[in-house]
Amino acid sequence: MYENFLLYNLKNLNELPSQAYWEYEKGKSIKTNDVLKAIEIRNKYMDKIQNLFKHYDFLALPSAQLFPFEKNLNNPEFINNNKIDTYHRYMEVYTLSSLLGLPTISIPVGFNNKGLPMGMQIIANVKEDNKVINFAKSYEEIFNFSKFKPELME
């Protein structure tokens, strides 16, 4: 983190964007035992996921917990009227595949009644990158959502 801090060319931590400062503050309190416990939890989740992949070729999840939000907003404060405690919450659906190192691809699945896009992430088992890419290619050839362009909003 220190080397990255130098790249910002900042005089003090308070000049960091709020999200980066939050990351720094949380990260500096992590101890070795915390990392070991996290690895143990990750391994348990990996076992559960491997069990799922015995029965399913892919897992499908939304690409986000909410539709795109106002461009001048750093992050939403609420999801479904529930106040969120960190900006990570609106991206939380990616946690599973990211932490477990699973090949994942997002594909467009349409728009809401305001014309805002939504996607679906397709997750494959470890080392099945080609399988998930081929699935996404076939899906796009059938549904071709990427050809639909909503009108730009002000």
Region spans (language model):
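Small-aliphatic-rich amphipathic alpha-helix that forms the alpha element of a beta-alpha
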Residues: 50-51, 84-107
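Structural helix-boundary/capping segments
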Residues: 35-36, 98-154
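Short, surface-exposed loop/helix-turn segments at secondary-structure junctions
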Residues: 37, 69-90
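Short helix-loop capping/hinge segments that flank enzyme active sites or metal/cofactor-binding pockets
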Residues: 1-50, 66-67, 103-109, 113-116
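Substrate-recognition/cap regions that form aromatic- and gly/pro-loop-enriched pockets
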Residues: 63
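Conserved acidic residues
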Residues: 57
